[in-house]
A protein has these predicted regions:
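Intrinsically disordered, low-complexity regulatory segments
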Residues: 1-141, 149-150, 214, 409-413, ...
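Basic, low-complexity terminal or inter-domain segments flanking catalytic cores
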Residues: 2-5, 16, 25, 151, ...
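Short active-site loop/helix that positions an aromatic residue
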Residues: 16-20, 92-93, 172-179, 361
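C-terminal or mid-to-C-terminal helical accessory/interaction module adjacent to the motor/catalytic core
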Residues: 113-197, 242-246
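Metal- or metallocofactor-binding catalytic centers and their adjacent structured scaffolds
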Residues: 217-252, 426-432, 439, 544, ...
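Short acidic, hydrophobic short linear motifs in intrinsically disordered regions
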Residues: 237-241, 248-262, 287-291, 445-457, ...
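A conserved hydrophobic secondary-structure block that centers on an alpha-helix together
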Residues: 259-261, 265-272
Length: 781
């Protein structure tokens, strides 16, 4: 009989832990949850105190059977799933499904995968915490109620196949509201006045000192008048203040701050950061990655101290204890940190190494001395004016934690990173001025959310928890309520007036403004669903209500309230509002917007959500003639499209002429404008407008596509039509029966025979599964 069976969540973790525990322990993985609510059913008996109905998915039945057999043969079963609510629920489901007995079942937890942590956990087992299980179950059931009851409402009122989630809907609302703020924003112009003064340095050599007027000037006329007044004015130092400034290091990483900083510094998505952090954790390199605690253990602070002294000396050490300030912080474990502070780097992929380096630096910096700076401010008066210029100098006297780590910001161009020292100055000193420049600047609209800034906003509002941020952001994109994308900037003119050598030079310049990268945009479907839910289910979309539900989950976890009473209070209000909304008859289809009338016919022109997305419609179902529909162009929005733009869409598709005896037309589809010839679609580049493209330009695009296709197909074999040698993005490869196979670099693809191809396929199949045509990163089922 096997003495001990340890069950963890992931196979990677199982391998690592088995090495620590020795021959008396067998470690197996549950591969996450082994059962869940039934997928196609409501699975909750409301009448019986919200009793859930769980099932073991088909792909987990063989695994569960294996675990049952192993559990029966073991003297003791150790449930070692993660130390959060989700992990506690996994342990409880294992206990129930495997029919374990309390006398030979032990629950153990650890927040780092090291030998000492695992052995300590074995020495300190506990029971399954049913309060944590109930908190997870309450979240799961509440989310099922919302999703299962709201989705049919959306199918009937908005569009088939839509779905709604509790936290996801609030996240979409934030993005929709930000988009509307941006469209409503009115840019205001003002002039920023800067001056260069020539001041002698310690060697008597004139150096430039930059200063800025303490206020912005509203109009060009005022700015010009100010420059004119400066022509005959004298300038002098009125006051000089020097004060010490200290900068304190940021706290160690929580889940959300790691997601934010990895996005800003490394360009990682929220999901990517969590995947890499999971790997680092399972390899034993970092502590548990789902936490809202900023606390460090004594082991970590001592390790940090030793590493700092060894690398930089005693002066750089300042041990700190950080307090968690997040609303409803629930996790008892530590911040995310390296398991051993002396390990400045680890083995792994390039991405894993970069993330580890970020975590190590942030943790070390948190236990380092403040940076000490000296800030000097000089006020410069202008004769005959109450206005003053201000020159600011800042110099680092002691770098402290900045030697290791500098925090990033969402808008890095707002951050002055260079320290500079002002030249020697004294009160009353007369100054000679160089150029004085008035530059027209504009107020900036609110920025769209990035994944990282959305996480920060959700955390500020107390919505979601460390385990829910990444799934929430992934889900709203998968449902196509939100899309991540880039926006090209627009050209804008601005005015610059320069006073130099007693003359004012007036010039207009151009700049590109408003360019954005990897930002979250609401789709038309997302906007319509948001507006519908906000109108008919205001509680679900209310930030405070959603945060209060999170607080109730925390109270369940603490054992302060019964989870069933929370469910009842919610359901008794929510369910009637669902039934009432289903009964309401609306005059127009939800989300429909009337743009005006078609000239000549007087028919109504509108935009609405159609079966395949947003469409423009001319006419109504009540008219004698059937309505006409046109798909909107990529980049057009239901909220902003004009009548003129809508009518233009009905000019497409248009026929350009014939090429090689076949018709050539241009149109717009779901993925943008295209040319169609002989059943072959060719995408239009951004430089060509579908309303203006000529037949000759279309012919060129057709020929270019053919050339690319010719270059792509290297070799085919008549005797094996399913096998082909192709040229891909990463070089030549063999495709065969839905799988792709690499061709070694030292082989010329054109020289390969069918037998050689089949031999390469056989060799690679023996090593492991080939890449499918779905792509390297296709989800495993």
């Amino acid at each position: 009989m096997q003495k001990n069976l340890v069950i963890v969540e992931s196979p990677a973790k199982a391998k690592t832990i088995e090495k620590f525990l020795g021959k008396d322990f067998k470690v197996l993985s549950s591969y996450g949850h082994i059962r869940d609510l039934k997928k196609k059913e409501f699975s909750i008996d409301v009448e019986k105190n919200f009793t859930p109905s769980y099932e073991i998915p088909a792909d987990k039945k063989a695994l569960v059977s294996t675990l049952k057999t192993e559990a029966k043969e073991a003297e003791t079963v150790w449930l070692a799933s993660d130390e959060d609510r989700e992990g506690e629920a996994i342990a409880w489901h294992l206990y129930e499904v495997l029919k374990l007995k309390p006398e030979n079942t032990k629950r153990i937890v650890f927040h780092e995968i090291t030998k000492s942590a695992i052995l300590k956990a074995i020495e300190q087992p506990r029971d399954i915490d049913l309060n944590l299980v109930n908190a997870q179950q309450a979240r799961r059931i509440l989310d099922r109620i919302v999703g299962f009851e709201l989705s049919p409402v959306l199918w009937r009122k908005v569009k088939p196949a839509l779905s709604a989630g509790r936290v996801q809907s609030v996240a979409v609302r934030l993005i929709v509201e930000r988009e509307r703020e941006i469209h409503a924003f009115q840019t205001e112009a003002a002039y920023r006045i800067t001056a260069v003064f020539l001041v002698p340095d310690t060697d008597g050599k004139l150096v430039e000192m930059k200063a800025e007027l303490a206020r912005r000037i509203k109009t060009k006329e005022e700015a010009k008048a100010f420059l004119n007044a400066c022509q005959g004015a004298s300038f002098a130092i009125d006051d000089i203040t020097t004060r010490p400034v200290k900068k304190t290091p940021p706290a160690p990483f929580t889940t959300s701050t790691l997601q934010q900083e990895a996005a800003r510094k490394l360009g990682y998505t929220v999901a990517q950061t969590m995947m890499l952090a999971q790997r680092l954790y399972e390899s034993g390199f970092i502590t548990y990655m789902r936490t809202d605690s900023v606390n460090l253990s004594e082991f970590a602070t001592t390790g940090s101290k030793d590493a700092i002294i060894k690398m930089m000396g005693d002066r750089y050490v300042h041990l700190r204890h950080f307090e968690t300030k997040t609303k409803g912080a629930q996790e008892a474990h530590e911040a995310i940190r390296p398991t051993y502070m002396e390990n400045q780097s680890v083995e792994g992929t390039a991405q894993e190494k970069k993330l580890y380096d970020l975590i190590w630096k942030r943790t070390i910096a948190s236990q380092m001395a403040d940076a000490e700076l000296e800030k000097t401010t000089a006020t410069i008066t202008i004769s005959g004016s109450s206005d003053v210029f201000t020159a600011i100098g800042e110099v680092i006297k002691f770098d402290g934690f900045l030697r290791v780590y500098r925090e990033s910001y969402d808008d890095d161009n707002e951050q002055e990173d260079e320290s500079h020292l002002l030249p020697p100055l004294k009160k009353g000193q007369k100054l000679e001025h160089g150029p004085i420049i008035a530059t027209e600047r504009f107020t900036q609209r609110p920025p769209r959310y990035t994944e990282a800034s959305l996480v920060r906003k959700l955390e500020e509002l107390g919505i979601g928890r460390p385990s829910t941020y990444a799934p929430t952001i992934s889900t709203i994109q998968q449902r196509e309520y939100v899309e991540k994308g880039n926006k090209d900037g627009e050209e804008r003119q601005f005015n610059v007036m320069t006073l130099k050598d007693c003359q004012i030079k007036d010039e207009n310049h151009t700049e590109i403004t408003g360019a954005e990268k990897a930002k979250l945009f609401p789709t038309d479907t997302g906007t319509v669903v948001n507006d519908f839910l906000t109108e008919y289910f205001p509680d679900i979309l209310d930030f405070n209500f959603t945060a209060s539900v999170e607080k109730e989950f925390d109270e369940i976890a603490e054992g302060e309230v019964k989870w069933t009473s929370i469910m009842k209070n919610f359901y008794d209000k929510f369910h009637p509002s669902v039934e009432n909304t289903l009964a309401i008859k609306t005059e127009h289809k939800v989300g429909e917007r009337i743009l005006g009338e078609e000239p000549g016919t007087g028919k109504t022109v509108s935009v609405k959500i159609g079966r395949f997305g947003p469409v423009v419609q001319i006419g109504t179902v009540e008219d004698e003639e059937k309505p006409r529909f046109a798909q909107m162009k990529k980049g057009q929005s239901m909220e902003t499209i004009t009548l003129e733009e809508a009518l233009e869409l009905f000019k497409l598709p248009r026929t350009l002429g014939e090429y090689e005896g076949k018709s050539v037309s241009v149109g717009v589809g779901r993925f943008g404008p295209y040319v169609l010839h002989n059943k072959v679609y060719v995408s239009l580049p951004k430089t060509l407008d579908p309303m203006e493209i000529t037949l000759e330009e279309a012919e060129q695009l057709i020929l270019e596509k053919r050339q690319k296709e010719t270059e792509r197909h290297i070799k085919k074999f008549e005797e094996e039509p399913e096998l082909e040698i192709l040229n891909g993005r990463y070089g030549p490869y063999i495709t065969y029966k839905g799988s792709n196979y690499k061709i070694p670099k030292d082989i010329v693809p054109q020289d390969l025979s069918l037998a050689s191809c089949l031999e390469l396929i056989k060799l690679q199949d023996e090593k492991g599964p080939a890449t499918t045509k779905k792509g390297r990163f296709a989800k495993k089922k």
